[in-house]
């Protein structure tokens, strides 16, 4: 038998809220690896 045959689930990264969309406090705007995009004024960054 082979030792391959495994695959991880997709990580669903990317932009979650686009310009003009209404957001509430706590909404996720972008999911990314590292800090490719930095938050602007009055926007926090978790983890």
UniProtKB/Swiss-Prot annotation:
<comment type="similarity">
    <text>Belongs to the bacterial ribosomal protein bL27 family.</text>
</comment>
<dbReference type="InterPro" id="IPR001684">
    <property type="entry name" value="Ribosomal_bL27"/>
</dbReference>
<dbReference type="InterPro" id="IPR018261">
    <property type="entry name" value="Ribosomal_bL27_CS"/>
</dbReference>
<protein>
    <recommendedName>
        <fullName>Large ribosomal subunit protein bL27c</fullName>
    </recommendedName>
</protein>
<dbReference type="GO" id="GO:0006412">
    <property type="term" value="P:translation"/>
</dbReference>
<keyword id="KW-0150">Chloroplast</keyword>
<dbReference type="GO" id="GO:0005840">
    <property type="term" value="C:ribosome"/>
</dbReference>
<dbReference type="Pfam" id="PF01016">
    <property type="entry name" value="Ribosomal_L27"/>
</dbReference>
<feature type="region of interest" description="Disordered">
    <location>
        <begin position="1"/>
        <end position="21"/>
    </location>
</feature>
<keyword id="KW-0687">Ribonucleoprotein</keyword>
<keyword id="KW-0689">Ribosomal protein</keyword>
<dbReference type="GO" id="GO:0009507">
    <property type="term" value="C:chloroplast"/>
</dbReference>
<dbReference type="GO" id="GO:1990904">
    <property type="term" value="C:ribonucleoprotein complex"/>
</dbReference>
<keyword id="KW-0934">Plastid</keyword>
<dbReference type="GO" id="GO:0003735">
    <property type="term" value="F:structural constituent of ribosome"/>
</dbReference>
């Amino acid at each position: 038998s082979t030792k391959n045959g495994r695959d991880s689930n997709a990580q669903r990264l990317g932009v979650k809220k686009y310009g003009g969309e209404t957001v509430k406090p706590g909404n996720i705007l972008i999911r990314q690896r590292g800090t490719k995009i930095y938050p602007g004024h009055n926007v926090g960054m978790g983890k």
